[in-house]
Amino acid sequence: MTAFRTLDHADVKGQRVLVRADLNVPSENGVVTDPTRIERMAPSIVELADKGAKVILLSHFGRPKGRDAKDSLKPVAAEVAHTLKRPIRFVDDCVGEVAERAVAEMKPGDFLCLENTRFYPGEEKNDPAFVAQLAKLGDIFVNDAFSVSHRAHASTEGLAHVLPAFAGRTLQAELEAFEKVLDKPARPVAAIVGGAKISTKLDLLGNLLPRVDVLIIGGAMANTFLMALGKKVGRSLVERDLVDTAQRIMDEAKAAKRELVLPVDAVVAEKLEAGAPTRVVDIDHVGERDMILDIGPRSIEYVCSVLARAKTLVWNGPFGAFETEPFDTGTVEVAEAAAELTAAGKLVSVAGGGDTVAALNVAGVTDRLTYVSTAGGAFLEWLEGKPLPGVEALRIK
């Protein structure tokens, strides 16, 4: 990865290194419930400390309107210390005298976690005065938070313009994984785009279509495409105002000689609830009272056959209402197939987005794909081809 400055370009020994991490992790009553992001960034910050850096962690947490104890990073800092098995000092401010004094007392190899950057309005406004206050605490800036790099905030983008700036190992791993699937992919490339609504995926579909060889449409958004083909979808979720848009996308795929895959059968029920009576029907035989809630066995088989001939897969969005059994079957079986192909060295597989990660967790394959991004909005914006301010600021000019 030559386009971005990484830690390979940085001499951190004895330096105060401001690391923008993403410590905005799920928690309940002050207890972290999913430490995945912390576990992922741990090797990156341990590397810095082992090279003699004074490691200062910056992050937001939640969406506070000013200082609010429930949005303090203190319990998260404790979880970071637990994960690293190293002491971490927590400071209940991120700028000013208290923070400056704590940084001044650090020794090489020490860790310090500062308080929630969003306690200050200057963070989200990318206020130069707030950036300057943060910059006083460091000699070097490391962005290790891809998941917030689509935000031009003080601690993601602003600092990169006032301090020597580098991509941390976690961010580097994301960028290298993405390069493999869209910038320099092994072909054929298949993309799975699922979820409920086309309206939230229009930019994504527009960016992917010219780049992939096969576009697989899943989830409720497939219903709008089916309606455009004149199929009856009963009481299924559908965006009637986007039927023409779905038709246009299919026309563009045909003109570009891209294969567009839609369900050929479906699992239907009259209610979306666990244990509801279900039927498998051909896509031409969806009844008036039916709701399409998952892809059927023939669709699963066809999607798996597409993946078997692909070399690269990018996946965003589930196939069905995976939160409710048995409507998780399509997503789980396709995920299992992707994991097996990846393990056999036949497929490079990158997936991301909130619902996608949750669905892959249900399938139990998160650690068996090439890379699963925990970055929600940033992953989607990257797939849409949009520049991410926090990443662009690290680009070698």
Regions from the PLM with identified roles:
Residues M1-K397:
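Active-site loop-to-helix "anion-binding N-cap" substructures in soluble metabolic enzymes
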